[in-house]
């Protein structure tokens, strides 16, 4: 049997990290078993579902490279199918029309609560014949009243619900639209889903859905209910913990591999290994290894992983993601070094692509002024001689190579009988405007000869003005 999983978000907001982790687990289980992964948009909540949210979900999935084999399917385009099944169930007696008013239902629940009883529908219309009237009605599933529903959850083990505790679920509203719990069942059946991976908040839906599947004569899939994600304070993850949409992590400068690596470890482990390539995730991932305890989100760990991926990934690949941030920060990269060369130069220290983009600005455009602290320390009178001598040597360079630039810096220090730092630091501030950069010879090489000459002239003028002021 081919393994077939699905990710079925509701388009009422962005794709958040909890949803992204569920999608990843479902995707990995399919890929690890040479199966298929389906994307389904559960948009039956017509009031809250929006095209913008749907677009955000698709964008997030594409950015994470969680490709799907089928879909996206939209529940709102399948209403005819749901209504067809509801009509069959009414005819077969596995569902019935309920004419109870909202007022009667509310009174019933109040009385049950007063007696300390479980609040559920009392079956008033369960065995009554349909009325030949225009009275409004809902359609309820005739849930079994005896026995129990048992399923073996990949994460939580054996779970059992007594049928006596389950309600006769509404499967069609008064206006005729099918309900979420019913649509899910029909979709999983029609799409051949063999394993449902979802959040633990769906556990109570599972016995109802299993009973409907059995009533339809449909196969029951396997289930894996993953725990929620907590903030680092132990509370449910929310916006105050920085719980944001997946694309916000893109905007903040994270690589998709870093976020995926972090999310896969947020509840799953393989020995003591922390860093996983996508291929390793596919190789080692197993639903049975997911921890049933809730996991706490740790931004510091995510940053550490992101820094690792920026440093260790192919510079060309990192540059392809960096392009977005350069454009976002209005940095024109058409007049400067190759972006992959900038990545190679700066990746050692960068924690995020956003940070890397900001720190690379001087490679592509001139700066208005020198950093005050760096200039005060390194653009003093003693810097005038090394700056002037190096500029002379720079003008005589015919081959613009890293080796030639390094030799010019070394020759300047030798002729002036000073340490390399006495030449390198004034040059660094002159060329970048700041006190930190990659190796000064590499920095000068990437900035280019013309820009370097202009900036050294600017620095010489700055030092001369300080001396004369």
UniProtKB/Swiss-Prot annotation:
UniProt-listed Pfam families: Anticodon_2 (PF19269), tRNA-synt_1c (PF00749)
Residue positions binding Zn(2+): 98, 100, 125, 127
Compartment(s) where it occurs, according to its Swiss-Prot or TrEMBL record: Cytoplasm
Motif range ('KMSKS' region): 236-240
Catalytic activity: tRNA(Glu) + L-glutamate + ATP = L-glutamyl-tRNA(Glu) + AMP + diphosphate
Keywords (A to Z) from UniProt: Aminoacyl-tRNA synthetase, ATP-binding, Cytoplasm, Ligase, Metal-binding, Nucleotide-binding, Protein biosynthesis, Zinc
One of the record's GO molecular function terms: tRNA binding
Residues that, per the record, bind ATP: 239
GO biological process, one term: glutamyl-tRNA aminoacylation
Chain coiled-coil ranges: none
NCBIfam families for the chain: gltX_bact
Protein name: Glutamate--tRNA ligase
The organism's taxonomic lineage, starting at the top: Bacteria, Pseudomonadati, Pseudomonadota, Gammaproteobacteria, Alteromonadales
Gene: gltX
